[in-house]
Each structure stands twice: as structure tokens, then as C-alpha cells.
């Protein structure tokens, strides 16, 4: 008798995606982060739903409603900190997931890669709007500064900013619409993630060697289910350590002060996961140029498949490209660090150098070195 999971219309989809899915036998722990992102998304939706039950999207009560959640709601503090630090875990997994795609050449699966970039942009938009909701000082001024960047767009910029604000400044209308979008976007992200998986399962996963996986595949369950569970346990350990011991480590102290339009904080900066892009924006003196550089720093991922010059997909046997990849990682860490420093020399120069290096590595240096490797290995 055929197993019900193989014939039932709904269970068959789950079976072909998570149980009997033929998976390359040699994929490493770097492939765990896709499932961890799914777990993070589920956590964010559940905790966000409970927070939304007690939150009020009004400029007069938003800050006090968050305080009420932490002080008066049963276990409200842990729900709030799980949601805030869960976002950090989400982005940590997201950056590692994208980095793994770059390192092992997964961007050759173009549909999966492009949906992934769409997912990255949507998650960034969701996180930005979520950061505005507590209505602290950094929430208010972060929203003002980032939305104001759209005024750099010629002709329609000023009208566009006022349209997003719903008035002449960030106010009640802005907060209400940001809450509405922040609530609906995670469900759109879930749909995009399902499409991401659909495209991935059309072609099958890449593997560390960058060769065809077809000759040697094993079922996803129990092998990779067990492997993913180990990753989930380790991520939970890291998240709970943050939540229970250092809940405000990745936050900004200014956000514990209610929003005040008349008092500007000395340093306006977004959450740590946006800092590399914000550093690129800040390193260009021209406003429009900065905005274009900011957008390009993310959208550059879309043209990486077009810049592929190597004849070997993975970087596993390409030591020069490996070296450049880790220089790129170090460069992104430098950009993240530089935003926390005052806007003065030598920090301005370091930021500008790191920004130029970021684009040079991806657009010029890495493709050129790949050609050199082809020559050296006589491909």
C-alpha cells in the first residue's frame, strides 16, 4: 500500500519538499541557514502577532504601549526582546546565506537568486518600518533621515517624501501606515520564500564542489532534518543568551527616550544590519550620489551572475578568489564599524576607501582574478 504522504494532494507537496526531496550528499553546514531563516521568520510572525495585540500605532501612546508590554503584559518583555533580537538573528542568517551563495557560486541558479534579492530588499524594508514603531528618539529620527533621502530624486522627490509621510513631517499618519505595512509584509515574505523554494527545487541545490549533484543524492529526511535541527538548537542558544542576558546589546540607548522632534540625537544611525549600506551613503558628499550608492550596494547582487568569468563555479579550489572574498567580508565589517565613529578624519577617509573597495572588488577585481585563475589552471 502506498504511503499517504505520497498520494494526498497537500501532503505530497510537503513530502516532495521536505521528506523525500533528493538532496546532494555533500552539502555542508553553510546550507543550514535557509532552514534557519524559515525558523526566524516563523518566530518573528508569532512574536509580532502577540506584540500587535497590545501595541497602539498612535504618536501619543506608541512609546507607552511598548513600555506597557514590557512591564504589565505577562511575559511581554521576553516577547518584545525575542522580536527585537530575532530580527538581528534573521539578518545574521541572511547575510551568511547570501555570502554562501557568493562563495559557492549559487547565483548561477538565476531565478532562485533573483527571488532571493527581492526577499532581501523586502526584509530590509520590513525591519526599517519595525524600527520606527517603538517611537523612541532613534525611531523618529531614523525614519525622518531615511525617508528624507527620497527627496534626492529629481522632480518628484519632495512630493514623494510628503506622500510617504502623509503630511509635512514624520507624524501620526506615518506611524499608522508603517505599522500596517510592517504587519502585512512578513506574509508577503512567506509567499516569496515559498516561490524561492519552488525555484530551488526545480533545479536542485548547488554543492560545495560546484559540480553536478545528480549522480549522488540522498533523501532530505532524516539526514538533513537532523542536521538542520542541530543548527536550530545552536541559533536558539545564541538568541536566548542575547534575550536573557544582553537584551539591549544590539539596540540603541536613545530609543529609550520618547520621540522629540525638537531634539536631535548627536548620532543618528539605523540598526547594525543596515550600517554597511548607511556607511556607503554617508561616504559620498552628494545627496543623490549617496542614495544611488546606497541602492547599488544591494542591487549589485543582481548583476553578479553577469560578472561571472570563471570556468569553475565554486571558490573551493580557487585560493585567490577565496582571499578576495574574505577581504570583501572584512571590508563590510569595516563599513559597519565606521558608522559608529564621529564624522571626522580619519574616519571619513576610511569610509570612502572601504566604499570604493566594496564596489571595486565586486565589479572589477574579482572578475579579473577569476580570468587569471582560468589562465593559471589552463581552463
Curated annotation (Swiss-Prot):
Positions contributing to heme b b566 binding: 97, 196
Annotated membrane topology: Multi-pass membrane protein
Sequence intervals crossing the membrane: 33-53, 77-98, 113-133, 178-198, 226-246, 288-308, 320-340, 347-367
GO CC entries: mitochondrial inner membrane; respiratory chain complex III
Compartments reported by the entry: Mitochondrion inner membrane
One record GO biological process: mitochondrial electron transport, ubiquinol to cytochrome c
Cofactor needs: heme b
InterPro entries: Cyt_b/b6_C (IPR005798), Cyt_b/b6_C_sf (IPR036150), Cyt_b/b6_N (IPR005797), Cytb/b6-like_sf (IPR027387), Cytochrome_b (IPR030689), Cytochrome_b_C_euk/bac (IPR048260), Cytochrome_b_N_euk/bac (IPR048259), Di-haem_cyt_TM (IPR016174)
Predominant place of localization: mitochondrion
Binding residues annotated for a ubiquinone, in chain numbering: 201
SUPFAM superfamilies in UniProt: a domain/subunit of cytochrome bc1 complex (Ubiquinol-cytochrome c reductase), Transmembrane di-heme cytochromes
Misc. comment: Heme 1 (or BL or b562) is low-potential and absorbs at about 562 nm, and heme 2 (or BH or b566) is high-potential and absorbs at about 566 nm.
Subunit field text: The cytochrome bc1 complex contains 11 subunits: 3 respiratory subunits (MT-CYB, CYC1 and UQCRFS1), 2 core proteins (UQCRC1 and UQCRC2) and 6 low-molecular weight proteins (UQCRH/QCR6, UQCRB/QCR7, UQCRQ/QCR8, UQCR10/QCR9, UQCR11/QCR10 and a cleavage product of UQCRFS1). This cytochrome bc1 complex then forms a dimer.
Recorded family membership: Belongs to the cytochrome b family.
Function, in words: Component of the ubiquinol-cytochrome c reductase complex (complex III or cytochrome b-c1 complex) that is part of the mitochondrial respiratory chain. The b-c1 complex mediates electron transfer from ubiquinol to cytochrome c. Contributes to the generation of a proton gradient across the mitochondrial membrane that is then used for ATP synthesis.
Protein name from the UniProt record: Cytochrome b
Protein's organism: Avahi occidentalis (Western woolly lemur)
Amino acid at each position: 500500500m502506498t504511503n499517504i504522504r505520497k498520494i494526498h494532494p497537500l501532503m505530497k507537496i510537503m513530502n516532495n519538499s521536505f521528506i523525500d526531496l533528493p538532496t546532494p550528499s555533500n552539502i555542508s553546514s553553510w546550507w543550514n541557514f535557509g532552514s534557519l531563516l524559515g525558523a526566524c521568520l516563523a518566530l518573528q510572525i508569532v512574536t509580532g502577532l502577540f506584540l500587535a495585540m497590545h501595541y497602539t500605532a498612535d504618536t501619543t501612546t506608541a512609546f507607552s504601549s511598548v513600555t506597557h508590554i514590557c512591564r504589565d503584559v505577562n511575559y511581554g518583555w521576553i516577547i518584545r526582546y525575542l522580536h527585537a533580537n530575532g530580527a538581528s538573528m534573521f539578518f545574521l542568517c541572511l547575510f551568511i546565506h547570501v555570502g554562501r551563495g557568493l562563495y559557492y557560486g549559487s547565483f548561477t541558479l538565476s531565478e532562485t537568486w533573483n527571488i532571493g534579492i527581492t526577499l532581501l530588499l523586502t526584509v530590509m524594508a520590513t525591519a526599517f518600518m519595525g524600527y520606527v514603531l517603538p517611537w523612541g528618539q532613534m525611531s523618529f529620527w531614523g525614519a525622518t533621515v531615511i525617508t528624507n533621502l527620497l527627496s534626492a530624486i529629481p522632480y518628484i522627490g519632495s512630493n514623494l517624501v510628503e506622500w510617504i509621510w502623509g503630511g509635512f513631517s514624520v507624524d501620526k499618519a506615518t506611524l499608522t501606515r508603517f505599522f500596517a505595512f510592517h504587519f502585512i509584509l512578513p506574509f508577503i515574505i512567506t509567499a516569496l520564500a515559498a516561490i524561492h523554494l519552488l525555484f530551488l527545487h526545480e533545479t536542485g541545490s548547488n554543492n560545495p564542489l560546484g559540480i553536478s549533484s545528480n549522480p549522488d543524492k540522498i533523501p532530505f529526511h532524516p539526514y538533513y532534518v537532523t542536521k538542520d535541527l542541530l543548527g536550530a538548537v545552536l541559533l536558539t542558544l545564541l538568541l536566548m543568551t542575547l534575550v536573557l542576558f544582553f537584551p539591549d546589546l544590539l539596540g540603541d540607548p536613545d530609543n529609550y527616550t520618547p520621540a522629540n522632534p525638537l531634539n536631535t540625537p548627536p548620532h543618528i544611525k539605523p540598526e547594525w544590519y543596515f550600517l554597511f549600506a548607511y556607511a556607503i551613503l554617508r561616504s559620498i558628499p552628494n545627496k543623490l550620489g549617496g542614495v544611488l550608492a546606497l541602492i547599488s550596494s544591494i542591487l549589485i547582487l543582481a548583476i553578479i551572475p553577469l560578472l561571472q568569468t570563471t570556468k569553475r563555479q565554486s571558490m573551493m579550489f580557487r585560493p585567490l578568489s577565496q582571499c578576495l572574498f574574505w577581504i570583501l567580508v572584512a571590508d563590510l565589517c569595516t563599513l559597519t564599524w565606521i558608522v559608529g565613529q564621529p564624522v571626522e578624519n580619519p574616519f571619513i577617509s576610511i569610509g570612502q576607501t572601504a566604499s570604493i573597495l566594496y564596489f571595486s572588488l565586486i565589479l572589477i577585481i574579482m572578475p579579473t582574478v577569476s580570468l587569471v585563475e582560468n589562465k593559471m589552471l589552463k581552463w
